[in-house]
């Protein structure tokens, strides 16, 4: 049981870090598109 708990804890940490990385990349990519659309208008 302890190993299962440790594995689930590590999996949750890895998934959360990956989600944070993806979210940060999405946040970084969105602003240029919005600014470009505003400039075209």
From Swiss-Prot:
Keyword annotations: Antibiotic resistance, Cell cycle, Cell division, Cell inner membrane, Cell membrane, Membrane, Stress response, Transmembrane, Transmembrane helix
Modification(s) after translation: The N-terminus is blocked.
Keyword Cell inner membrane: yes
GO cellular component labels: division septum; membrane; plasma membrane
Any Pfam family the entry gives: Blr_divisome
Periplasmic side stretches: 25-41
Transmembrane segments: 4-24
InterPro entries: Blr-like
UniProt KW Transmembrane helix keyword: yes
Membrane-topology descriptor: Single-pass membrane protein
Disruption phenotype: Inactivation increases the susceptibility of bacteria to a number of antibiotics that inhibit peptidoglycan biosynthesis. Increases the susceptibility to cycloserine, bacitracin, and a wide spectrum of beta-lactam antibiotics. Does not affect susceptibility to fosfomycin, valinomycin, tetracycline, chloramphenicol, gentamicin or quinolones.
Cytoplasmic side: 1-3
Subcellular location, record wording: Cell inner membrane
GO biological process, any: cellular response to stress
Oligomeric and partner information: Interacts with FtsL and several other divisomal proteins, including FtsI, FtsK, FtsN, FtsQ, FtsW and YmgF.
Function description: Component of the cell division machinery, which is probably involved in the stabilization of the divisome under certain stress conditions.
Name listed for the protein in its UniProt record: Divisome-associated membrane protein Blr
Organism of this sequence: Escherichia coli (strain K12)
Name of encoding gene: blr
């Amino acid at each position: 049981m302890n190993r299962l708990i440790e594995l689930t804890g590590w999996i949750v940490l890895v998934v959360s870090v990956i989600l944070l990385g993806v979210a940060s990349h999405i946040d970084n990519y969105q602003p240029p598109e919005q600014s470009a659309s505003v400039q075209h208008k």
